């Protein structure tokens, strides 16, 4: 559906003409391509591989490029563009010249035109000199061109002009501050004024390859304060909409989508707002709509995948909001410096003009203006998506698109608020999708269990004759079971004669497979497909034995597709040649003709799992008939092993009890009735209640304050059901005279206690005493006592505190915050809390974290307090800080809410130790853990010997070559020691993994990793090509040398293991110097480790990008190295090209720079910038 993308400027339907790759070097391999509805054929029973998905994506790119060329040629020849015919004649098998694809990407990315509602200026970042501008810039800025420019009076707006001369002095200062920011987009919009006219503009900045692009959109007020207030008001409206989303009952994605379109329409005022969902086969569907009553409905509309090209979808993950003000407006040319080698990239510009075909489509459907917003969710790394490119797992789920029947311009602050709403919608949607997936997995597992139980208790026919049946496992129209030559059909299924013909075809053409799935039997090559007709188009079959088969069938797709606008009325003038939603719908129906809904990955997983279970069940049933005597002998051995395991677990349990009793944090436990059965020394000290007195008391009735009873009751009931909660505040009574009846506040984590049968028998609470902080916060919020004395006291009991006014500007930043973050009060006061303070100064972990923080802050300003919100961030030196945020409304003496107070709580080492003790209760991998611990222990002795030998060699007289060899040996020994000494993989997951910081030379790392690969290179007959400039080896950088060495060695050895024998392996290293925002220097290093051919198998690459699961030790090693690299703010990609495959590792490393500290000691210490 061309209009579908609205502002995206994408295909015939909204995809074409706008959002393509940032550069032509971003090949189709760089995005996840789903299996197209247009293509079919046979697939293995296992879910489709990522290689197959990438192949489909490449095919999609070629189709997109061909359609683009047809449209361009029709314009040049004066002929009309026949939309439907072009779709029919453009096939997936046809090849497209590479230059045609490059031209297609470049045409839209570097089109050279903008929309006329604003103007654009491109600037060299280092000199502020203009390198390009739109032709309407002079008019919008009120600059009159010189009739005859001279040296004394040069042209005011010309190439080489300092852009600061066009704006007021205060505006120039704001631009200078933005240009040095690490993330320039976080400061958008910058409020600036034209020097000639004083007219205000929103300056929206982003970096490109040749400089900085400044998009200038006219603002509606001349007071910057009003602009800030307007932006905050837009954010408040978005927060209100987000609150409505969060208040919805869970488990209803349709209701969530319906609510978001209503919210967006209320927020923006567009005539129509829709939610587009991209299906697994990449075609789109309108799943929710809010519109003006007189407009034609689009709800239920489906459109082919080609309507929104792959390039457009990729770019929506980069530029998430796109507005077209008037599709009929004449675009404005961008002129640029002649010295630039190619047209400027306008992908990130808010003003970029739509492509002609998209404007034409919008006009055909009566839509003049549009706003398109990406809905991004976290892709499931475990499903293997995105692993081939090595990219992170952000996935474009769909779009929210707004249409208007007249021109409409939404100011940037409101668009930013909409983006904010979309991020929250994506988070909420992601949770709902995960919940739906979990529910589906549970349902499938339950069905599988019941089916297997039927199979063992009754005859095999029970899985089709009883309920549930195999039809309940996946969505289908029919199913069948062929068992020992007897046929059991269900629902819409072929006849017995037809199914035997299908089996003969399977055994003749797919005998070496374990099964097959297809959405079109005809395209899969089955000669009898026509006889089956539309009733049986798609089929999935699982081979149980050589003579037993399970089948599932699906009818053609078109019968399930309903759209209210599909009916063609006589007065409608459009036809198949014109680009229109009705044309898109008919094209989609043509594409899916004689084709069923594709089999989804989760469905293939369910079928394959049932296949394995049934195979094992059949084998066990047969084996049970002949092995009863053997079983009787073996069983006592299993019992003895069980007793030994119980003894070991008992020893562990006794050790756990001892650790809990002596812990320095409060720990207590209750049985299933809520009565105390555990009470350690610390909680006894805090409450004045001894262990003997506490035992048997009711936690809720006897020990908790009445106002806290509801919270604790809820916490208990959820934990007894297995739902464990964290960071819940509990208010406990005290019982000793010394405590004078004062309350004790403890923040607890609830942990379900289980017996040896895994039944929940109680709840254990691990807590942290926050009484002192609570008292301070209560006084502070109520403005009791001396305000300044509390906030700025150096007393360690005063927590880190910051405050925001009603416009989210920072107005308080106490000493504890200065110490925690490294940023002084004077540096942050007056800046925007969200974006500037937290975002630019203190970086957060991604846009989702920024969105969640903004919601919390605005909720507090709106009067809704938040307690113990997880708030991790990076301090000034790049150190990762884990904190809990409490945000409270800030109230004036008159009781009016005037902002927010925020308190940070840093978990104490004691609490972290207690949580580590809690995690040790997991004994599933107890035996393997013991073996690993044994290996790590005994390997330390020879390591110690190696270290001693190396130290002796260091004291001898060595030449330069010998010194280098010794240095390499020492580095490898240190690498082993670090790996053996730090086995806590969970700390890598949660970001608390400690990275050391030291100066080192890149050449030392290269020597160490090459030395580890030499034996394997010789064994496999491989030539090592080192493309490393000598000057790079001598560069001194700052970071964790051993960890960098570890992960680079792992990636290199993996490449070597899977390189073809007697071939080559290449190491390429390049670097680019970079100036950081604080004036420090850094280098961006790119390591490329390549080999010819396909390289690593897809299963291993999938293991590498798993978030939690792995199937091989080598996959685990790659996964751990990827996560360590991520903690260093680096990234790794695995890229397959036509003739080679390679790892691309990107890491920024600061160059040590000495700067004297302003201390009285004058000891010559250094301040070093650290990236992580």
Curated annotation (Swiss-Prot):
InterPro entries: GAF (IPR003018), GAF-like_dom_sf (IPR029016), HATPase_C_sf (IPR036890), His_kinase_dom (IPR005467), HisK_dim/P_dom (IPR003661), PAS (IPR000014), PAS-like_dom_sf (IPR035965), PAS_2 (IPR013654). Residues 24-54 have a biased composition (Polar residues). Keywords: Chromophore, Cytoplasm, DNA-binding, Nucleus, Photoreceptor protein, Phytochrome signaling pathway, Receptor, Repeat, Repressor, Sensory transduction, Transcription, Transcription regulation. Expressed in fruits, flowers, leaves, stems, seedlings and roots. One of its GO terms (biological process) is detection of visible light. Homodimer. Interacts with ADO1 and PKS4. Stabilized by interactions with PAPP5 and FYPP3 which are enhanced in the phosphorylated Pfr form. Interacts with VOZ1 and VOZ2. Binds, via its photosensory domain, to PTAC12/HMR/PAP5 when photoactivated; this interaction stimulates its localization to photobodies. Interacts with CRY1 specifically when in the dark/far-red (Pr) state, but not when red light-activated (Pfr). Interacts with PIF4 and PIF5 in response to low blue light (LBL). Component of a red light-dependent nuclear complex made of PHL, PHYB and CO. Interacts directly with PHL. This is Phytochrome B. It comes from Arabidopsis thaliana.
């Amino acid at each position: 559906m061309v209009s579908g993308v609205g502002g995206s400027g994408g295909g015939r339907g909204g995809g074409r003409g706008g959002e393509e790759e940032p550069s032509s070097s971003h090949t189709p391999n760089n995005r996840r391509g789903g299996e197209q509805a247009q293509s079919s054929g046979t697939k293995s029973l296992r879910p489709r591989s990522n290689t197959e998905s990438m192949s489909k994506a490449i095919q999609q790119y070629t189709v997109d490029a061909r359609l683009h060329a047809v449209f361009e040629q029709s314009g040049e020849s004066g002929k009309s563009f026949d939309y439907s015919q072009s779709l029919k004649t453009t096939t997936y098998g046809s090849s497209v010249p590479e230059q045609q694809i490059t031209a297609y990407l470049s045409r839209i990315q570097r089109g050279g035109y903008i929309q006329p509602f604003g103007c654009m200026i491109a600037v060299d970042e280092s000199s502020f000199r203009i390198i390009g501008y739109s032709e309407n810039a002079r008019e919008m800025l009120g600059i009159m061109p010189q009739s005859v420019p001279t040296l004394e009076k040069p042209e005011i707006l010309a190439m080489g002009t300092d852009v600061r001369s066009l704006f007021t002095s205060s505006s120039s200062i704001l631009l200078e501050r933005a240009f040095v920011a690490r993330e320039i987009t976080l400061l958008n919009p910058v409020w600036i004024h034209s020097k000639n006219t004083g007219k205000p503009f929103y300056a929206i900045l982003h970096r490109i390859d040749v400089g900085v692009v400044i998009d200038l959109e006219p603002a509606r007020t001349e007071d910057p304060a009003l602009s800030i207030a307007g932006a905050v008001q837009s954010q408040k409206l978005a927060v209100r909409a987000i609150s409505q989303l969060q208040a919805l009952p869970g488990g209803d994605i349709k209701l969530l989508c319906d609510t978001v379109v209503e919210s967006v329409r209320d927020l923006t005022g567009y005539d129509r707002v829709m939610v587009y969902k991209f299906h697994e086969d990449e075609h789109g569907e309108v799943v929710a709509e809010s519109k003006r009553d007189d407009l034609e409905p689009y709800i239920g509309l489906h459109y082919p995948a080609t309507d929104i090209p792959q390039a457009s979808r990729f770019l929506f993950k980069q530029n998430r909001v796109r507005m077209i003000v008037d599709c009929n407006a004449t675009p404005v040319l961008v002129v640029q410096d002649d010295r630039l080698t190619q047209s400027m990239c306008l992908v990130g510009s808010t003003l970029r003009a739509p492509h002609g075909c998209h404007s034409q489509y919008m006009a055909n459907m009566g839509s003049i203006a549009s706003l398109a917003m990406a809905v991004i969710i976290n892709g499931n790394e475990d499903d293997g998506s995105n692993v081939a490119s090595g990219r992170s797992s952000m996935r474009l789920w769909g779009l929210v698109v707004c249409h208007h029947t007249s021109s409409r311009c939404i100011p940037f602050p409101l668009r930013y608020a909409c983006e904010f709403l979309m991020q929250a919608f994506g988070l909420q949607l992601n949770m709902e999708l995960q919940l739906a997936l979990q529910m589906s997995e549970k349902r499938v597992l339950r069905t599988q269990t019941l089916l297997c139980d039927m199979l063992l208790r009754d005859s095999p026919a029970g899985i089709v004759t009883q309920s549930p049946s195999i039809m309940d496992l996946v969505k289908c129209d029919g199913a069948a079971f062929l068992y020992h030559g007897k046929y059991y059909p269900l629902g819409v299924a072929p006849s017995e004669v037809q199914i035997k013909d299908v089996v003969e075809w399977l055994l003749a053409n797919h005998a070496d497979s374990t099964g097959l799935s297809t959405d079109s039997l005809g395209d899969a090559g089955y000669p009898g497909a026509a006889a089956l007709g539309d009733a049986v188009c798609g089929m999935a079959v699982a081979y149980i034995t050589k003579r037993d088969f399970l089948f599932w069938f699906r009818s053609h797709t078109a019968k399930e597709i309903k759209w209210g606008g599909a009916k063609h009325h006589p007065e409608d003038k459009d036809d198949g040649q014109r680009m229109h939603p009705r044309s898109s719908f008919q094209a989609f129906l043509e594409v899916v003709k004689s084709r069923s809904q594709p089999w989804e990955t989760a469905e293939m997983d369910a079928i394959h799992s049932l296949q394995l279970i049934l195979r094992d069940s059949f084998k066990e049933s047969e084996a049970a008939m002949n092995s009863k005597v053997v079983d009787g002998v073996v069983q006592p051995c299993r019992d003895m092993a069980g007793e030994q395991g119980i003894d070991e677990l008992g020893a562990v349990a006794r050790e756990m009890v001892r650790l809990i009793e002596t812990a320095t944090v409060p720990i207590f436990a209750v049985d299933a009735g809520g009565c105390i059965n555990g009470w350690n020394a610390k909680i006894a000290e805090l409450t004045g209640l001894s262990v003997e007195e506490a035992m048997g008391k009711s936690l809720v009735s006897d020990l908790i304050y009445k106002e806290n009873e509801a919270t604790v009751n809820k916490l208990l009931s959820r934990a007894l059901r297995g739902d464990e909660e964290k960071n819940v505040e509990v208010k406990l009574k005290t019982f000793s005279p010394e405590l004078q009846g004062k309350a004790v506040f403890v923040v607890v984590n609830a942990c379900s206690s289980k017996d040896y049968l895994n039944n929940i028998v109680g709840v254990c609470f691990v807590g942290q005493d926050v009484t002192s902080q609570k008292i301070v916060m209560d006084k502070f919020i109520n403005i009791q006592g001396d305000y300044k004395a509390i906030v700025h006291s150096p007393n360690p009991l005063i927590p880190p505190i910051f405050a925001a006014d009603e416009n989210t500007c920072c107005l308080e930043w106490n000493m504890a915050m200065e110490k925690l973050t490294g940023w002084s009060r004077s540096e942050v006061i007056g800046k925007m809390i969200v974006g500037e303070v937290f975002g630019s100064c203190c970086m957060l972990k991604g846009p989702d974290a920024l969105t969640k923080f903004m919601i919390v802050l605005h909720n507090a300003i709106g009067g809704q307090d938040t307690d113990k919100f997880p708030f991790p961030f990076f301090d000034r030196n790049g150190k990762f800080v884990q904190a809990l945020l409490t945000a409270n409304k800030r109230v004036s003496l008159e009781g009016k809410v005037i902002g927010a107070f925020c308190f940070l709580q840093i978990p104490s080492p004691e609490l972290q130790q207690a949580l580590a003790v809690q995690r040790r209760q997991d004994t599933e991998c107890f035996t393997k853990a013991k073996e690993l611990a044994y290996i790590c222990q005994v390997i330390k002795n020879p390591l110690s010997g190696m270290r001693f030998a190396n130290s002796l060699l260091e004291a001898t007289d060595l030449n330069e070559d010998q010194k280098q060899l010794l240095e390499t040996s020492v580095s490898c020994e240190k690498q082993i020691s670090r790996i053996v000494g730090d086995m806590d993989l969970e700390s890598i997951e949660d970001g608390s993994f400690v990275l050391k910081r030291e100066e080192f030379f890149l050449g030392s790392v290269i020597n160490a990793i090459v030395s580890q690969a030499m034996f394997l290179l010789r064994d496999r007959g491989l030539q090592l090509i080192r493309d490393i400039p000598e000057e790079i080896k001598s560069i001194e950088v700052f970071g964790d040398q051993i960890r960098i060495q570890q992960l680079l060695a792992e990636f290199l050895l993996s490449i070597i293991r899977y390189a073809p024998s007697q071939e080559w392996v290449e190491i390429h290293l390049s670097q680019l110097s970079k100036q950081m925002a604080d004036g420090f220097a850094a280098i961006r290093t790119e390591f490329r480790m390549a080999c010819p051919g396909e390289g690593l198998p897809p299963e291993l690459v999938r293991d590498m990008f798993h978030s939690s699961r792995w199937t091989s030790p080598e996959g685990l090693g790659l996964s751990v190295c990827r996560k360590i690299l991520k903690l260093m703010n680096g990234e790794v990609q695995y890229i397959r090209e036509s003739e080679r495959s390679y790892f691309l590792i990107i890491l920024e490393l600061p160059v040590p720079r000495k700067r004297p500290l302003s201390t009285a000691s004058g000891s010559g210490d250094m301040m070093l910038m650290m990236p992580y």
